Each structure stands twice: as structure tokens, then as C-alpha cells.
Amino acid sequence: MGRKKIQITRIMDERNRQVTFTKRKFGLMKKAYELSVLCDCEIALIIFNSSNKLFQYASTDMDKVLLKYTEYNEPHESGTNSDIVEALNKKEHRGCDSPDPDTSYVLTPHTEEKYKKINEEFDNMMRNHKIAPGLPPQNFSMSVTVPVTSPNALSYTNPGSSLVSPSLAASSTLADSSMLSPPQATLHRNVSPGAPQRPPSTGSAGGMLSTSDLTVPNGAGSSPVGNGFVNSRASPNLVGTTGANSLGKVMPTESPPPPGGGNLGMNSRKPDLRVVIPPSSKGMMPPLSEEEELELNTQRISSSQAPQPLATPVVSVTTPSLPQQGLVYSAMPTAYNTDYSLTSADLSALQGFNSPGMLSLGQVSAWQQHHLGQAALSSLVAGGQLSQGSNLSINTNQNINIKSEPISPPRDRMTPSGFQQQQPPPPSQAPQPQPPQPQPQPQPQARQEMGRSPVDSLSSSSSSYDGSDREDPRGDFHSPVVLGRPPNTEDRESPSVKRMRMDAWVT
């Protein structure tokens, strides 16, 4: 692509003609200089413009060149404009023809600038388009339940995800690498019969954990999801979140309860894990006898391997991707863990009841605090060694600001059932662990508090619903989990504690 050619005719515009003359005169002198140097010759240029102004150029000395010219008498080449035009026509340069048909193929500097700008904008658009699918949606929230109580339940998680992989950082201590299985092989392993299945969600699906032995009921419809995670925007009843409410209130499900008293059967490989979903907000789970509880505790202890370095408990982790709702996500500082560490006696007081929908633990080793990146989703308690068979529920659901549709009857303006929040004593003053006591049916007066799980009395999360029921929290710290326990056996046998255990019985 060369310079745009113009028609060689007289320029009518005076100003344009003057500019062209100046530029081309300098170009001509430049060419004369190059020729004189390259070919070792003498050149003299004599130019008169349209106004008879003289411009001359000589490679050495004009008088010397002119003297040599006047004294030269031999035949020589002499050319005029007509000779140049004829020479150009013979060489088919067509210098006199108008090159208008070629203008569409010639790029001027201005046109090249436009093309470069268009190319840069297109490259930026393509680059942003490629990056956009990898970003998690800002208004999209996922709820993930991670059961890792036996070697067969350890699922594979994408290391590139900052949501779940930090909570399973301790899983690298497991010796058997064959416990890891890709989530694609376990997406559709356990689905309730006779119900349609929802396809896997597309938002950040690569980083979500797929639980191979968990059936998640969907409270918004009648389709259980077997892929291990549920879109919490479409299902108000999630495993481990009790109706997507971090206070543990029971939301009624529109779908009929599954057979067997609301128990969803797990896979035959883990008979000790069952997800218990209350049929409605006014129903309560049937009590378990002492023999059944002891049998389940024995199964939990026996199912955990002795040489296994870590048996990760079941934790419901929810993506805190709704910053516009004003929820406070606060990390649990290390000082909290040292001042209020869990002991065997504390867990014995908490043994036997969990939040409805949470999965009970098997053998639990030492916990460590996991800080989940910018979301500050760290409510895993880093305490001492936990006793075998101890039950502990940690609800970190912060996905939805529930402010409407309370289904349960009106509640008292106090902590549920009078179960006061107490700080656990130091480990040096902790009593010995006590076995769980069989509990009879709760008293009828506790029916008005049935909609609230005991996790509410444990100050489960930082939801804005019923915020006036508690004391005013500190502005700089919101404790996701405050574990309270009855101070002695008499308090644990009180009707309020009995109602709380019955309200959240998990097997």
C-alpha cells in the first residue's frame, strides 16, 4: 500500500498549491542530494515559481555547474515534461490517469488510526467477554453442604474456588488419595424416587462440592436435587439452613413430607446419616428412645476409622454474595477461640440436639479456624479435642435477608425457652463429659417456640430477622456461633432443654 496518488494537473486552490510546492520542492532537493551522493555527480536545480520567484539548488557550486554547462558542446540527453509523460506511459505507470478507482484500497494515516482504535476496542471486548463467565454473579447465592464423616464421603473440590476449598484444607492429611472422587461421577447418585430432578446450576458450579450421599429437599417445589447444592434463591428450605433462615426458623414445605416420618434415607454405605426435615412448622419430630440414641452413637464411633487423622464434621457453607442487603460478615478472631474453647463437658451438654436439617457428626478431631477469603465466612470453631459421638452444629447461612412471612405463632420477647446464653467455662473448670439422657415428650407450653431451632439460642448467625430478641451486638464484631450449655445436670433436664432437644432432633 503506497501513498494515495493524485491527478497530475494544475492545483486550482492557491493555498493548496503553495503548500504542495513547498513540500515537493524540498522533496526534489532531497532526491537531488541523494542522487549526487550515491552516484557521485553534480546537480544544479533552478526553480521559478508561479510568481517568478527563484529557488536554486546545487550539489557543489551553482556557478561552477553553470560554467560547465555553458561550455559543454557535445550531444546530450535533454528532456521535458512531455518526455517524462511519454516515458511513464510506456512503463505503464499511468501517472496521468486519475486513480479514483484505487482510492478504496488506499489507507491514509487517519484511516489507519481509526482501524487501530476499532481493533483495540474489539480486543478489549473479547477479553472482557472471556473473563466474564468465570466471575461469580453478584446476585447469585449457593448453599453447599459438605458431609465428610467417613472416608467414602470425601468429595472432590475445585482448587480454584475460594468458597469451599479452604474449609477442606485439612483433608490433605488423609492418607488414602482414592477417597477423592470427581463431582461429575456423583451428581446424580442419590435422588428420591418419583420426583423430577433439577439440572445442575451454572453459576460457579466448578467450585461447588458435590455430595455423593445426600438428598437435598427443595422447599419451593417438589423436586429434590441430587447434585449436592441448591440455588437458595429458589428453595427456602435448605439442608443445614432450615428454610434458608440463619436463625433456624422452620419454614413450611409445599411438597408432601417423604415417607418414614420425614427421614430421607441415605445410601446403604452410611446408615448413620439421615437428613431430618420437619413436615411443617407446626410438626415436631418423634422422640428417639435411649436405645436408638445409643445405637446411633455407637454406629458413629464405629464408622470412623481409628488411624484417620481428621474426620471433618458436616458444615453448611453458604456463599455470601449479597452485599447489598447489608449483612455483616465477621471473622472469628483467635482470641475468641482461646478464651472460649470447647471442652468435652460443653459438647456433652450440647449432645443430642442439632438444628433441624443439619447432619450429626461422627468422630470429631481438633478443629481449626478457616477464614474464607474476602467473604470472611469463618465460623468453624477452633477448640480443643472433641469427644467421640459429640454432636455439634454450626450454621453459617448468610445468603438471604429474611424479613417477611413468619410462619410460626407469635414468640416471646426473650431467648427461646429461657435457655440463657452462657459462656463456656475455661477448660480447667470443665466437668467430665456426661452421656446423653433420654428425653420424654416436650411440654405443651413449649409449642409456641417450636418454630425456632436451638441454634437460635446459640446465636447461630447474623440475620436481621428478630434482631431485637437478643442483646445489642457489638458494632465491630458479630459472632456467628456462640455455644451455650446448661451449667449442670438439673438445667439440662429442665423442660426447656427437653423441648429444645426435641425441636431439633437429628439422627
Swiss-Prot record:
Beta domain: annotated segments: 289-296
PROSITE patterns per record: MADS_BOX_1 (PS00350), MADS_BOX_2 (PS50066)
Positions of post-translational Phosphoserine modification: S59, S98, S235, S255, S355, S408, S453
Residue ranges of domain MADS-box in the record: 3-57
Region span, Required for interaction with MAPKs: 266-283
Composition skew (Basic and acidic residues), residue ranges: 467-477, 488-507
DNA-binding feature ranges: 58-86
Subcellular location per the Swiss-Prot or TrEMBL entry: Nucleus
Region (Disordered): 175-269, 390-507
InterPro entries in the record: HJURP_C, MEF2-like_N, TF_MADSbox, TF_MADSbox_sf
Record keywords: Acetylation, Activator, Apoptosis, Developmental protein, Differentiation, DNA-binding, Isopeptide bond, Neurogenesis, Nucleus, Phosphoprotein, Transcription, Transcription regulation, Ubl conjugation
Cross-link (Glycyl lysine isopeptide (Lys-Gly) (interchain with G-Cter in SUMO)): K403
Comp. bias intervals (Low complexity): 453-466
Positions marked as site (Cleavage): D176, S177, D213, L214, D466, G467
Record-linked CDD domains: MADS_MEF2_like
Statement: the UniProt record of this protein carries the keyword DNA-binding: yes
UniProt biased composition (Polar residues): 209-245, 390-402
Processing and modification events after translation: Constitutive phosphorylation on Ser-408 promotes Lys-403 sumoylation thus preventing acetylation at this site. Dephosphorylation on Ser-408 by PPP3CA upon neuron depolarization promotes a switch from sumoylation to acetylation on residue Lys-403 leading to inhibition of dendrite claw differentiation. Phosphorylation on Thr-312 and Thr-319 are the main sites involved in p38 MAPK signaling and activate transcription. Phosphorylated on these sites by MAPK14/p38alpha and MAPK11/p38beta, but not by MAPK13/p38delta nor by MAPK12/p38gamma. Sumoylation on Lys-403 is enhanced by PIAS1 and represses transcriptional activity. Phosphorylation on Ser-408 is required for sumoylation. Has no effect on nuclear location nor on DNA binding. Sumoylated with SUMO1 and, to a lesser extent with SUMO2 and SUMO3. PIASx facilitates sumoylation in postsynaptic dendrites in the cerebellar cortex and promotes their morphogenesis.
GO biological process: apoptotic process; cardiac conduction; cellular response to calcium ion; dendrite morphogenesis; ERK5 cascade; MAPK cascade; mitochondrial genome maintenance; mitochondrion distribution
Entry domain remark: The beta domain, missing in a number of isoforms, is required for enhancement of transcriptional activity.
Similarity annotation: Belongs to the MEF2 family.
Function: Transcriptional activator which binds specifically to the MEF2 element, 5'-YTA[AT](4)TAR-3', found in numerous muscle-specific genes. Also involved in the activation of numerous growth factor- and stress-induced genes. Mediates cellular functions not only in skeletal and cardiac muscle development, but also in neuronal differentiation and survival. Plays diverse roles in the control of cell growth, survival and apoptosis via p38 MAPK signaling in muscle-specific and/or growth factor-related transcription.
Assembly: Binds DNA as a homo- or heterodimer. Dimerizes with MEF2D. Interacts with HDAC7. Interacts with PIAS1; the interaction enhances sumoylation. Interacts with HDAC4, HDAC9 and SLC2A4RG. Interacts (via the N-terminal) with MAPK7; the interaction results in the phosphorylation and transcriptional activity of MEF2A.
Designated name of the protein: Myocyte-specific enhancer factor 2A
Organism: Sus scrofa
